[in-house]
A protein has these predicted regions:
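Short histidine-centered beta-strand/loop micro-motifs
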Residues: 50-52, 60-65, 82-85, 104-106
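Short beta-strand segments in beta-sandwich/barrel cores
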Residues: 59-60, 76-80, 92, 122
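A short, N-terminal "cap"/entry segment at the start of jelly-roll beta-barrel domains
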Residues: 1-46, 130-134
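Conserved hydrophobic/aromatic beta-strand scaffold that supports enzyme active sites
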Residues: 36-38, 49-53, 70, 92-94, ...
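Short, charged/polar surface micro-motifs in flexible loops or helix N-caps
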Residues: 44-46, 55-58, 77-79, 99-100
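Double-stranded beta-helix
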Residues: 106-134
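Glycine- and acidic-residue-biased ligand/ion/polar-headgroup-sensing regions
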Residues: 56, 65-82
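Short acidic-glycine-tyrosine-enriched beta hairpin
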Residues: 81-100
Length: 134
């Protein structure tokens, strides 16, 4: 291993943490029945990775991302009102840039937890596709 590579690998220590914490204080309230657990917040390139937790009956309002989003369901299940599929544990989800969707956890599901890898902003839209918040 080159000296430069060795120095680079030693400059940043490993980070190993329990992804789904027992400590409720690590979940950040986002909206009614919705919490997130930040894992990575990269202010250089706008990348973020988090766990999203939504309780039964929870709805993440209509929103869009300007860049791709990748998700992996760890617990429970959820769906988008705009699609006819249901994401269940082990499901990998790709959201194309610019798609507007509404994430729903149905009443019969206790809660869902999904790992999301996001690039860029998140904008919320009304039913006329007008930006209302970002």
């Amino acid at each position: 291993m080159s000296e430069e590579l060795l120095q680079a690998t030693q400059a940043i220590p490993d980070l190993v943490t329990k992804a789904i914490p027992d400590d409720e204080r690590l979940w950040v309230p986002q909206a009614d029945k919705i919490w997130f657990r930040p894992l990575i917040l990269n202010t250089t390139n706008g990348e973020w990775v988090n766990l999203l937790r939504i309780a039964k009956g929870g709805v993440m309002n209509r929103h869009r991302h300007p860049a791709p989003v990748y998700g992996y369901v760890l617990k429970g299940e959820w769906r988008y009102l705009e699609h006819d599929w249901v994401a269940k544990p082990g499901t990998f989800v790709f959201e194309p840039p610019g798609e507007i969707h509404t994430l729903v956890v149905d009443e019969e599901v206790e809660e869902m937890i999904t790992l999301f890898h996001v690039f860029g902003a998140l904008g919320y839209y009304d039913e006329d596709d007008t930006l209302i918040q970002h």
